[in-house]
């Protein structure tokens, strides 16, 4: 098993900064703002080729109230999940009562714990950490996470020896293929098409929507545990949380995201970062669950978010939440509104659920798998060309400047979303109505559901363009005789 390392401590001691440093990412939101991290965030890290899982947690200070109570519960759960704990304290702020309370809890759990004093840059490390020895956790390791000072020493002299004791190096991670593919995607590289098997990779499933529509409640319902903070307050989730899971022998990576509001209502800098993370999560996902509040109906912001999903080419499943408790008359009105405002999304499945009570949640995954399979299915050039030919036979392309547009052949240009490339003459002059006709024809013929189809057109090149006709010697002699004859006749 890959060791699990949890970062715990008071708010704003630098846990997310160290998390980003260890995982070599910027996945965790970082700001000089206590209480920014609210959910457990997992990341992959390594030291000298040895991998471990790092968990970033929300701060604990003993004065939690409201949503902060749920944050503290998440941090305590992370301690239970971890094999080793890095207990972080703030060297600049000094020893606090909350530090003593956390240390007491850690001692009661009897977990391997290492005390890390952060923010020692510009200070005498020995002098800055002396008060923390009273916590009774042994050696103290001074670092400056924001600049990386002391982090490598922490890994080499603390984590690596501990890992050598508890995890033999010969152990192979059974998820290595997934993480290798993840690294390839992150670096912008692409594996050869012959080696690609979409069924061998986890389906990345993003749950998005406006604030407080029930995204985290749905996430917890799917997982069957209180994995993310749920509170009846808009903006509870601030970061995108990636959660591996398995259902019906199929692997998924569930992505719970922050709510997206109208741009004019986003005033907090942290919320702006959260929105960016949500949009990045959409682009990173294979399938997106767009959650809509049945009691509030479809807003312009829902349509804006829907537009971003479609422009990103992601597969889509629409989820209407909070369906329980509505009268039959209201339900009919909601369905009519959906048909009217979302009529152009005829390829997406719509589910009416209650995330709180779990009604119809289990049926979501059938639509998710259908959408993913449609977006990654391989189709041969012969099949696509045959479909294109049938479409032309059923409805001829229009005349352009007196000439009929000619479509020659079609082939696949990409997947997730499926891209069909059509070659022909004057194809760029085709009207939008005929392009939509072709797109719908391909969708029906291929039985594509849950994912948009994109069609690209390429003009056939004229082989004689920009070439001069060079006469042969015989043609030159004939031309001279012809010119002489013309001159004599004049």
From Swiss-Prot:
Name of the protein: GTPase Der
Subunit structure: Associates with the 50S ribosomal subunit.
Described function: GTPase that plays an essential role in the late steps of ribosome biogenesis.
Residues at which GTP 2 binds: 209-216, 256-260, 321-324
Gene3D superfamilies: 3.30.300.20, P-loop containing nucleotide triphosphate hydrolases (3.40.50.300)
KH-like domain segment(s): 377-461
SUPFAM superfamilies: P-loop containing nucleoside triphosphate hydrolases
Family under the similarity heading: Belongs to the TRAFAC class TrmE-Era-EngA-EngB-Septin-like GTPase superfamily. EngA (Der) GTPase family.
Signal recorded as keyword: no
EngA-type G domain: residues covered: 3-166, 203-376
NCBIfam families the UniProt entry points to: GTPase_EngA, small_GTP
